């Protein structure tokens, strides 16, 4: 440990100044003026160290910055390595010959300049001083004594670095180099290495580190990254206007509905005039319908005139539920208002016009039944229901081509037999009209069965 004081150049067993061991080997009293900055703390006494050279006269101890007016104070406690012992004498040098002693450990308080870029709250108090020029480093040059590595330029990066920068781009919150903690050592703290200026804006939290240390990056404020993106003339707004007139019924500029539902456009393809998906929506269509009937599928009830075609709110034809041909022309409205029934789908629309003679009994039968009174007995309704099914089966029999061994033949025969059993279960109730209607229906089914049997031979 060195016993010399930077201010007095004397050993520790005497006064702190006034004695100097010159190169001649004798004690030459030299009166040095008192130091400009007195020591802040007393130093513990240290054992005297002989400064005599081992091979003769002692070598001079060269103090960096001594002739340039250096006024710093170097407290004892730092290790001074013996650089060389060649020639019988040794010369002590500081571990980093390019730096002044007051540059490393200075007693001057460092007041950071207020910068225009605010540091994040989690990084305040960690010796991270931000400056308006975008560089991080010591707050002011080290002093007039240190002329070797004077840090004057704002964008100056020293030619040598003492840390290993990884070649990969670090993460947003990854510490640079080999620092142990992720957040406490973003910049190397100025107690450790104050002269090293990191890459400019390279390791600010939230920005990836630059691969080139000397390249300056433009600083964009947080949350405003796309301000520098050039706007393409007049193509941005017409494109939005083109999307605004979309076919999905959104009249607003953006396609998704906001908290207040937007009114659908007049040319909407997927909006119905009777009901809209949003209940509180005010639609600008000309005459809104009175209370809608909530159709099962909005696409089926798009045409307002097609809603009254059937009771089931399907746009299918009413002829699916009535007998084909002349029956629909004569009393289709009467049947539809009195009888509610279901039947197989109509497969052949032109088959009824080929055999009009077979439909004459069925045409007269409903008229005779309904001419008596509006309150049709249930037995008559059941007979009419059976006759409607027989109409479709008769069409199937007319189209049948095959033999008795075919499955189609078995199916038609079984269906006709089932309708005969339905007619047998009808109770007449002592009424001649019901008995007559049932008899005619049974005769018709038997005639169809005979026709089917002849075709199957």
UniProtKB/Swiss-Prot annotation:
InterPro entries referenced in this protein's UniProt entry, alphabetically: BAG_chaperone_regulator (IPR039773), BAG_dom_sf (IPR036533), BAG_domain (IPR003103)
Domain BAG positions: 379-456
Predominant localisation class: cytoplasm
Positions of modified residues (Phosphoserine): 7
GO MF, one annotated term: protein-containing complex binding
GO cellular component, one term: cytosol
Compositional bias annotation for Low complexity: 1-20, 255-268
Pfam families: BAG (PF02179)
Intracellular or extracellular location(s): Cytoplasm
Coiled coil: none
Entry keyword annotation includes Phosphoprotein: yes
Region feature (Disordered): 1-104, 128-335, 348-374
Key words, A-Z: Chaperone, Cytoplasm, Methylation, Phosphoprotein
Biased amino acid composition, Pro residues: 31-48, 284-295
GO biological process: cellular response to epidermal growth factor stimulus; cellular response to tumor necrosis factor; negative regulation of mRNA modification; negative regulation of phosphatidylinositol-3,4,5-trisphosphate 5-phosphatase activity; negative regulation of protein targeting to mitochondrion; positive regulation of actin filament polymerization; positive regulation of cell adhesion; positive regulation of fibroblast migration
Modification Omega-N-methylarginine, positions: 41, 54, 108, 185
Domain of life, per lineage: Eukaryota
Polar residues compositional bias, start-end: 160-193, 326-335, 348-365
Subunit structure: Binds to the ATPase domain of HSP/HSC70 chaperones. Binds to the death domain of TNFRSF12. Binds to the death domain of TNFRSF1A in the absence of TNF and thereby prevents binding of adapter molecules such as TRADD or TRAF2. Interacts with PRKN.
Summary of the function given for this chain in its UniProt record: Inhibits the chaperone activity of HSP70/HSC70 by promoting substrate release. Prevents constitutive TNFRSF1A signaling. Negative regulator of PRKN translocation to damaged mitochondria.
Listed name of the protein: BAG family molecular chaperone regulator 4
Organism of origin: Mus musculus (Mouse)
């Amino acid at each position: 440990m060195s016993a010399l004081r930077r201010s007095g150049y004397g050993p520790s067993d005497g006064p702190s100044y006034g004695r100097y061991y010159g190169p001649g080997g004798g004690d030459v009293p030299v009166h040095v003026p008192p130091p400009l900055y007195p020591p802040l703390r007393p130093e513990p006494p240290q054992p005297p160290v002989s400064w005599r050279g081992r091979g003769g006269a002692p070598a001079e101890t060269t103090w960096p910055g001594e002739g340039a007016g250096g006024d710093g104070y170097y407290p004892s406690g730092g290790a001074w390595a013996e650089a060389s012992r060649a020639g019988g004498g040794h010369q002590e040098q500081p571990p980093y010959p390019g730096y002044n002693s007051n540059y490393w450990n200075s007693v001057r308080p460092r007041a950071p300049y207020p910068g225009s870029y605010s540091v994040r709250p989690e990084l305040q108090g960690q010796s991270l001083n931000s400056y308006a020029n975008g560089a991080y480093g010591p707050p002011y040059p080290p002093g007039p004594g240190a002329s070797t590595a004077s840090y004057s330029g704002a964008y100056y990066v020293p030619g040598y670095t003492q840390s290993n920068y990884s070649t990969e781009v670090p993460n947003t919150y990854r510490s640079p180099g080999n620092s142990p903690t992720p957040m406490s050592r973003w910049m190397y703290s100025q107690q450790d290495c104050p002269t090293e200026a990191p890459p400019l804006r390279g390791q600010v939290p939230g920005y990836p580190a630059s691969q080139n240390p000397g390249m300056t990056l433009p600083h964009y404020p947080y949350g405003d990254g796309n301000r520098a993106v050039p706007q393409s003339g007049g193509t941005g707004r017409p494109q939005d206007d083109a999307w605004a007139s979309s076919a999905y019924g959104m009249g607003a500029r953006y396609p998704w509905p906001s908290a207040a539902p937007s009114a659908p456009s007049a040319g909407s393809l997927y909006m119905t005039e009777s009901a809209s998906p949003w209940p509180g929506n005010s639609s600008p269509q000309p005459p809104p319908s009175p209370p809608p009937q909530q159709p099962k599928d909005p696409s089926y009830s798009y045409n307002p005139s097609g809603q009254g075609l059937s009771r089931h709110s399907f746009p299918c034809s009413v002829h699916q539920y009535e007998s084909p041909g002349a029956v629909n022309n004569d009393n289709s409205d009467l049947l539809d208002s009195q009888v509610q029934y279901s039947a197989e789908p109509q497969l052949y629309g032109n088959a009824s016009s080929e055999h009009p003679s077979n439909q004459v009994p069925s045409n007269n039968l409903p008229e005779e039944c309904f001419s008596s009174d509006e309150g049709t007995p249930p037995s008559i309704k059941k007979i009419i229901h059976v006759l409607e099914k027989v109409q479709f089966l008769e069409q199937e029999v007319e189209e049948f081509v095959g033999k008795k061994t075919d499955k189609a033949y078995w199916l038609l025969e079984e269906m006709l037999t089932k309708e005969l059993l339905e007619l047998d279960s009808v109770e007449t109730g002592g009424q001649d009209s019901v008995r007559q209607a049932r008899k005619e229906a049974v005769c018709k089914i038997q005639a169809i069965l005979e026709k089917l049997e002849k075709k199957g031979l």
